[in-house]
Amino acid sequence: MKPPILIIIMSTVILGTMIVMTSSHWMLTWIGFEMNMLAIIPILMKKFNPRAMEASTKYFLTQATASMLLMMGIIINLLHSGQWTVSNNLNPTSSILMTTALAMKLGLAPFHFWVPEVTQGISLSSGMILLTWQKIAPLSVLYQISPTINPNLLLPMAILSVLIGGWGGLNQTQLRKIMAYSSITHMGWMTAILLYNPTMMFLNLIIYITMTLSTFMLFMINSATTTLSLSQTWNKAPLITSLILTLMLSLGGLPPLSGFIPKWMIIQELTKNEMIILPTFLAITALLNLYFYMRLTYTTALTMFPSTNNMKMKWQFENTKKMIFLPPLIITSTMLLPLTPMISILD
């Protein structure tokens, strides 16, 4: 893809998300979603092979269905209230339709089936955009309508997402699918806290985006797409491989890394709201994610795959590509836990 075209498309993706986040009119919100969806499809098809085309088609069909449900909810709310203003006094029927539509856009269970398939069929850079930037717009609308969301609809979705995100990643060897199931799990944690402390959801989102961006950038540097290819990078670029493993443990929520912060604060907030069963279940199912990240860490760092070369390290390491934003992203992805007491605005 030529640079001028890529700049125009990326600008449209960013503009669509910004329109959704800043608009107070439901029609503008819907237009922002459509701009974002139509602009992201050429980015998903950047590789232009049958797998990428299939993934883009699946993404388009899912997002188009979600947009249709969203528009239906907007129209029902218009007929009920007589206004287009984005507010938190929605009609119950339109609230259910909008919540379902936004859950489809986010990839929450049981509407999660498209996320691993689409992520696996596209390039690492496209997958990075899909699993980070594309989550911002639906979550911002969920934040705006959170007072009217039915807990009996959203909480089962959150619990199912955490459970399926953990189970689905257990037998995966493809790194993109592992990241997709990790995304489903994190979306489940965010929607679980949405009804009790919406601001904490954005803290979780910021940390999740930081960790996912760092991990995908390191995958791109190593050109690693499977567990096998990742394990073979240890003797080429040991520093980068060790950083990937640290980031994966952070994504799994292992203390004392940054990924533990949102889990810790969400469990604390749910306990304050006299919810005992939900945080207990979330903490237990989080072990599924931590298990497959620990297993990936073990196979990559603590075992040596069969090789024709008996040398444990190459005499000259590969000259890897430089990424300017990578060092600060890695630092924030792994070392934020001591700063947790400073986050007093959420109390």
UniProtKB/Swiss-Prot annotation:
Subcellular location per the Swiss-Prot or TrEMBL entry: Mitochondrion inner membrane
Biological-process GO terms, alphabetical: mitochondrial electron transport, NADH to ubiquinone; mitochondrial respiratory chain complex I assembly
Annotated membrane topology: Multi-pass membrane protein
Main localization, broad class: mitochondrion
Assembly with partners or alone: Core subunit of respiratory chain NADH dehydrogenase (Complex I) which is composed of 45 different subunits. Interacts with TMEM242.
Protein family according to the UniProt entry: Belongs to the complex I subunit 2 family.
Name of the protein in its database record: NADH-ubiquinone oxidoreductase chain 2
Source organism per UniProt: Civettictis civetta
Chain's gene name: MT-ND2
